[in-house]
Amino acid sequence: MPKFMDVHHGMHGVTPEALQAAHQADLDIQGEEGVDFQRAWGDPESGMVWCISEAPSKEAVQRIHERAGHPATEVYPVPVEV
Protein backbone atom coordinates (compact mmCIF):
# COMPACT_ATOMS: atom_id res chain seq x y z
CA MET A 1 0.00 0.00 0.00
CA PRO A 2 1.31 3.53 -0.74
CA LYS A 3 2.90 5.61 2.02
CA PHE A 4 2.12 9.26 2.71
CA MET A 5 3.64 12.02 4.82
CA ASP A 6 1.25 14.76 5.82
CA VAL A 7 1.90 18.13 7.38
CA HIS A 8 -0.26 20.18 9.73
CA HIS A 9 0.38 23.87 10.47
CA GLY A 10 -0.99 26.01 13.29
CA MET A 11 -0.54 23.57 16.18
CA HIS A 12 1.65 25.95 18.22
CA GLY A 13 2.32 24.74 21.73
CA VAL A 14 1.31 21.17 20.94
CA THR A 15 2.10 18.91 23.89
CA PRO A 16 2.85 15.19 23.80
CA GLU A 17 -0.58 14.60 25.34
CA ALA A 18 -2.37 16.74 22.74
CA LEU A 19 -0.46 15.06 19.92
CA GLN A 20 -1.34 11.62 21.31
CA ALA A 21 -5.02 12.60 21.56
CA ALA A 22 -5.06 13.86 17.96
CA HIS A 23 -3.27 10.72 16.76
CA GLN A 24 -5.71 8.53 18.69
CA ALA A 25 -8.66 10.32 17.06
CA ASP A 26 -7.20 9.29 13.69
CA LEU A 27 -6.58 5.72 14.85
CA ASP A 28 -10.15 5.39 16.10
CA ILE A 29 -11.61 5.87 12.60
CA GLN A 30 -8.74 5.07 10.21
CA GLY A 31 -10.12 1.64 9.28
CA GLU A 32 -13.18 3.21 7.69
CA GLU A 33 -10.95 4.52 4.88
CA GLY A 34 -8.35 1.73 4.88
CA VAL A 35 -5.69 4.06 6.34
CA ASP A 36 -2.96 2.96 8.76
CA PHE A 37 -1.48 5.94 10.64
CA GLN A 38 1.90 4.75 11.90
CA ARG A 39 3.57 7.67 13.67
CA ALA A 40 3.23 11.37 14.38
CA TRP A 41 5.76 14.05 15.32
CA GLY A 42 5.24 17.60 16.51
CA ASP A 43 7.17 20.83 17.00
CA PRO A 44 5.46 23.09 19.56
CA GLU A 45 7.56 26.10 18.56
CA SER A 46 6.78 26.08 14.82
CA GLY A 47 3.31 24.60 15.28
CA MET A 48 4.03 21.92 12.72
CA VAL A 49 2.95 18.29 13.02
CA TRP A 50 3.91 15.48 10.64
CA CYS A 51 2.26 12.08 10.24
CA ILE A 52 3.29 9.00 8.29
CA SER A 53 0.69 6.56 7.07
CA GLU A 54 -0.12 3.84 4.59
CA ALA A 55 -3.33 4.45 2.69
CA PRO A 56 -5.12 3.76 -0.57
CA SER A 57 -4.86 7.47 -1.50
CA LYS A 58 -3.88 10.89 -0.18
CA GLU A 59 -7.57 11.79 -0.27
CA ALA A 60 -8.30 8.98 2.21
CA VAL A 61 -5.62 10.38 4.54
CA GLN A 62 -7.12 13.85 4.30
CA ARG A 63 -10.68 12.62 4.91
CA ILE A 64 -9.66 10.87 8.14
CA HIS A 65 -7.77 13.92 9.40
CA GLU A 66 -10.72 16.19 8.54
CA ARG A 67 -13.20 13.93 10.33
CA ALA A 68 -10.88 13.71 13.36
CA GLY A 69 -10.85 17.51 13.55
CA HIS A 70 -7.37 18.38 12.32
CA PRO A 71 -7.17 18.57 8.52
CA ALA A 72 -3.71 18.31 7.01
CA THR A 73 -2.31 21.34 5.22
CA GLU A 74 -0.36 19.13 2.81
CA VAL A 75 -0.23 15.40 1.98
CA TYR A 76 2.75 14.00 0.07
CA PRO A 77 3.27 10.53 -1.40
CA VAL A 78 6.44 8.78 -0.23
CA PRO A 79 7.41 6.63 -3.22
CA VAL A 80 10.99 5.81 -2.13
CA GLU A 81 12.10 4.63 1.30
CA VAL A 82 15.42 3.22 2.55
Predicted regions and their residues:
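Short S/T/G/P-rich N-terminal loop/turn motif that feeds into the first structured element of a domain
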Residues: 1-32, 36-38, 43-47, 58, ...
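Conserved short beta-strand edge segments in small beta-sheet-based binding/regulatory domains
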Residues: 70-82
